[in-house]
Amino acid sequence: MAFRKPDEIAEAAIEAGMKKIKLPLPSLLVLGFLGGAFIALGYLLDIRVIGDLPKEWGSLSSLIGAAVFPVGLILVVLAGAELITGNMMSVAMALFSRKISVKELAINWGIVTIMNLIGALFVAYFFGHLVGLTETGPYLEKTIAVAQGKLDMSFGKVLISAIGCNWLVCLAVWLSFGAQDAAGKILGIWFPIMAFVAIGFQHVVANMFVIPAAIFAGSFTWGQFIGNIIPAFIGNVIGGAVFVGLIYFIAYHKKDRSRKEMKQVS
């Protein structure tokens, strides 16, 4: 499987960020909806797979669920969609390279976040609630338990957990930029995403599905949901824009530019 060098991945990420800014509004709206829906479908698959497993399996059942969750991000990357957590890295890198403005970044992040929320709520309401995929038997119990675990954490703990989450998610996106074929992209995405789910980190878009799914089932409140989403979003920004985007921009983009300048001098 062909794979780009890190400095080439950095340039690919910056180029991807610029392309995201240039998307026409109708495309951005539709792709943002799909991004939220795809992640929600991945989480729904997770719940349906592990909901009926024996409790005695303990963390093994969590690992099995984590192993199927990456389907969501694979759909985002290969089928095409806009996901705010990935944009926190690529669009930020375009900003760091001075190819876009802060205003353009803010507009992109705002629209994609709103559409991700709508997509995730769509899956939670129509598939989870109306069809009953998260509201019957052990699946309801699992949905509520997962949502409870997200909501029980303090603001600070959610924020820190979200940093770790998007560090791994954006590393998955980074690896997908590096791979030059579908198999390589799938492999690059799979393991970092499986890791964040198995660990139990906080992902803002995933939470936009699982917490509302529990709310539609009669548990928790929208106020609790908002109280979770705010620190999860902030932490995801730090994890994606700083721990991946900024660090790799410093490590590889400037180094690449200095090499070009040295060649011009020589």
Curated annotation (Swiss-Prot):
Keywords: Cell membrane, Membrane, Transmembrane, Transmembrane helix, Transport
Transmembrane regions: 25-45, 64-84, 111-131, 158-178, 186-206, 209-229, 230-250
The keyword Membrane is annotated on this UniProt entry: yes
Gene Ontology MF term list: formate transmembrane transporter activity
Record GO cellular component, one term: plasma membrane
InterPro entries referenced in this protein's UniProt entry, alphabetically: Aquaporin-like, For/NO2_transpt, For/NO2_transpt_CS
Protein location: Cell membrane
Biological process, per Gene Ontology: formate transport
Main location: membrane
Claim: Nucleotide-binding is one of the keywords in the record: no
Membrane topology category: Multi-pass membrane protein
Family from the record: Belongs to the FNT transporter (TC 1.A.16) family.
Name of the molecule in the record: Uncharacterized transporter YrhG
Species of provenance: Bacillus subtilis (strain 168)
Lineage: Bacteria, Bacillati, Bacillota, Bacilli, Bacillales
Gene (name only): yrhG
